């Protein structure tokens, strides 16, 4: 039965990832990049400023922009940054890293669009703000069926399949480092995680905020130590990445097509640009203008890939471990780091993976809960979902690595297709919001959003109409 499932999933992934999704992600990302006038470069300083502003704003009764950023980063900065990169290099060669950089740079524009839309079309309930692709598909496009389809896909993807990926990597890391029984670890994971997911969204936000920053800094610190210790190899490694990306150097076994496909796959799994996941976290923030959260989430994509994923890539490529046949995933990263700093690194990385993976479990779970709320407000359904999440965490701990990752790729691809269509159709709303933000910044103001700046503001619930009714036509930005 498992072999049949592996075969079906493999065929579906080949159809999705060989051409279709690569073309869609690159073409939409390039389109948004040009329409936003290379926002990811020209507004990089503003991204940092807005993030710092969000970190300074605190409220007991709402989720701050920085907390929303941390929820999304908790999902992004998971095992994909460590295990996914190793798989990309093993299957696609060093050139896969180059294509990950490209997809992150142009994908950050897609992330800006989807997260800004999530803020514009967010809704409010007793627990605070909620939103995401399902909500802007219903309220912006007036297509509830499309929102429902996406809600089902993201709930299955993140809450169910992606959480099994995280637990799978954690269990393998502990098995490699300490010989820990994988089922036992799975039971421990669900015991701890179960106490958290019954605690509500705000508890999730606070936990994510407290863990994710420390983990990222710790891992980057170790990576920088490795980089500076091997600084003389850096030019050669960079040259290897570029040559392999275009098929000029096949020594590592990665042809152009393999490098491109693996780079895009693992890049999207790690930074989630255009996938429609981060907008669910972006919508929860209390902010004065939707563009602010769009900028913060775009910065998250760049940070995740260009800093954290690249750190893993250098750890691997500075060693000879990636030449070892059959070595992939977390085992490759553990072997590579151990070659740099000693055998203790395997255990250190296992513990780090546990914490990284746990953060990702938190973010992934929240995405599913938000979209179940879109489908049905039933508390019983949420309870069933929580039990399903816990069951899949145990399944991931004992399942085969390849099947788990292949399932993740399949559901991720379906999500991307639905979301990209929606954000393309709604992109003019974002372009208008950005013009409004830029206009207010040039006037020396802290931008504040009013929904009547848009010609059509049907479906927008949480943003007020401007106080000044005079000359409304002139305030609208075409």
UniProtKB/Swiss-Prot annotation:
Transmembrane parts of this sequence: 14-34, 85-105, 145-165, 185-205, 211-231, 236-256, 298-318, 342-362, 381-401, 411-431
Pfam family, one: Na_Ala_symp
PROSITE patterns cross-referenced by the UniProt entry: NA_ALANINE_SYMP (PS00873)
Any one cellular-component term (Gene Ontology): plasma membrane
Keywords, sorted A to Z: Amino-acid transport, Cell membrane, Ion transport, Membrane, Sodium, Sodium transport, Symport, Transmembrane, Transmembrane helix, Transport
Membrane topology: Multi-pass membrane protein
Signal peptide positions on this chain: none
Record's subcellular location: Cell membrane
Main location: membrane
GO terms, molecular function: amino acid:sodium symporter activity
Function: Probably functions as a sodium/glutamine symporter for glutamine uptake.
Family classification: Belongs to the alanine or glycine:cation symporter (AGCS) (TC 2.A.25) family.
PANTHER family linked to this entry: AGSS FAMILY TRANSPORTER, SODIUM-ALANINE, SODIUM_GLUTAMINE SYMPORTER GLNT-RELATED
Name assigned to this protein: Probable sodium/glutamine symporter GlnT
Organism: Bacillus subtilis (strain 168)
Lineage: Bacteria, Bacillati, Bacillota, Bacilli, Bacillales
């Amino acid at each position: 039965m498992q072999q049949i499932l592996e075969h079906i999933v493999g065929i579906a992934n080949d159809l999705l990832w060989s051409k279709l999704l690569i073309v869609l992600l690159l073409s939409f990302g390039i389109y948004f990049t040009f329409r936003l006038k290379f926002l990811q470069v020209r507004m990089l300083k503003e991204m940092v400023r807005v993030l710092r502003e969000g970190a300074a704003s605190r409220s007991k009764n709402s989720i701050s922009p920085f907390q929303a950023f941390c929820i999304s980063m908790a999902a992004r900065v998971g095992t994909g940054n460590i295990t996914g990169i190793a798989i990309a290099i093993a299957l696609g060669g060093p050139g896969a890293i180059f294509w990950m950089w490209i997809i992150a740079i142009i994908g950050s524009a897609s992330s800006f669009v989807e997260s800004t839309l999530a803020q514009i079309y967010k809704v409010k309930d007793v627990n605070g703000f909620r939103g995401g692709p399902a909500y802007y598909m219903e309220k912006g496009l007036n297509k509830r069926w499309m929102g429902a389809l996406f809600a089902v896909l993201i709930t299955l993807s993140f809450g169910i399949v992606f959480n099994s990926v995280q637990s799978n990597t954690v269990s393998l890391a502990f098995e490699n480092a300490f010989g820990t029984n994988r089922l036992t670890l799975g039971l421990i994971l669900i015991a701890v995680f179960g106490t958290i997911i019954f605690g509500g969204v705000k508890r999730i936000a606070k936990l994510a905020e407290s863990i994710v920053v420390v983990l990222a800094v710790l891992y980057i610190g170790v990576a920088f130590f490795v980089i500076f210790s091997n600084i003389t190899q850096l030019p050669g490694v960079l040259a290897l990445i570029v040559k392999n990306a275009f098929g000029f150097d096949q020594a590592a076994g990665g042809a152009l097509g393999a490098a491109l496909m693996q780079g895009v796959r693992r890049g999207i799994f790690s930074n989630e640009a255009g996938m429609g996941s981060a907008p669910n976290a972006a919508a929860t923030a209390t902010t004065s203008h939707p563009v602010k959260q769009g900028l913060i989430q775009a910065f998250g994509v760049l940070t995740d890939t260009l800093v954290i994923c690249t750190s893993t890539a250098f750890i691997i490529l500075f060693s000879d471990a990636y030449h070892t046949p059959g070595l992939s995933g977390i085992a490759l990263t553990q072997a590579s780091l151990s070659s740099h700093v000693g055998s203790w690194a395997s255990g250190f990385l296992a513990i780090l993976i546990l914490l990284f993976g746990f953060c990702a479990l938190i973010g992934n779970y929240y995405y599913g809960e938000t979209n179940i709320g879109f489908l049905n407000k039933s508390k019983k359904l949420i309870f069933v979902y929580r039990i399903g999440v816990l069951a899949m965490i145990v399944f991931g701990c004992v399942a085969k690595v390849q099947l788990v990752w292949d399932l993740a790729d399949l559901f991720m691809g379906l999500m991307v297709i639905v979301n990209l269509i929606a954000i393309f159709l709604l992109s003019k709303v974002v372009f208008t919001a950005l013009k409004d933000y830029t206009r207010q910044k040039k006037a020396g103001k802290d931008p504040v959003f009013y929904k009547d700046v848009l010609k059509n503001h049907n479906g927008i619930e949480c943003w007020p109409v401007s106080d000044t009714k005079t000359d409304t036509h002139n305030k609208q930005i075409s």
